[in-house]
Amino acid sequence: HAGERGREVARMLRKLVERHDPKKNGLVTFGSNYMPWENTQKAAEEVEVVGYNYAEYLYDAHHKKYPNWIIYGSETASTVQSRGIYHFPFSQSMLANDDEQCSSLGNCTTSWGAKGTERCITDDRDARFCLGQFIWTGFDYIGEPTPYSTKNSYFGQIDTAGFAKDSFYIYQSAWTDYRKKPMIHILPYWDFNEGQLIDVRVFSNAPKIELFLNGESLGVAEIDHENGKKLSGDWQIPYRKGILKALAYDEKDQV
């Protein structure tokens, strides 16, 4: 669909779908990596729903240009993370260290994917005209190693053993209601070298988070899940032996 015959082929395929699915059990669509290209946009006129792969930055402009299009994120995210692995500092973006593992802090990105899980969530949330998104991926899988040359992918929010990674809880905090099912998640584990500077992140669907170390408050973070760009509480603290605890509060400051 990126070439000059793209629209012609898209029209032919749409007619075949309509012939074999006269009751319209499914909608005609495609998921494209080439939505910036004019020929692809022409081909998109032939389908009923238009899918964008890693192109959330085009949503607003294309919605203005093609207000009748029904659009969605057909493939998004491609953030990478290994469960229980943390590469500090959080402010340093990377793909992997020499251990060929990706950091679960949220600072490992691919060249084509979202610049972070929070960005993936907020771009979709703020495009009110968008149907939603298909995240790449729910589970890790064998193949497509990024970084190369490991056995499996790191894209999943759940690993191949079926355990949720930290990123799983960012989505949970954004997509659930604390008034019905409150949740809070803290990372990383708390066992490092004395004095080592550690990034601590907390995810919750509640509007306020407070972090404690050995009973001492380290501060409060307020989260605006409706309109805010920052969906986590973040602290950077020197490691001290003890108990790290996070509490979530509702709008009346009730735990």
Regions found by a protein language model. Name each.
Residues H1-H225, S232-D253:
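Extended substrate-binding grooves/exosites of carbohydrate-active enzymes
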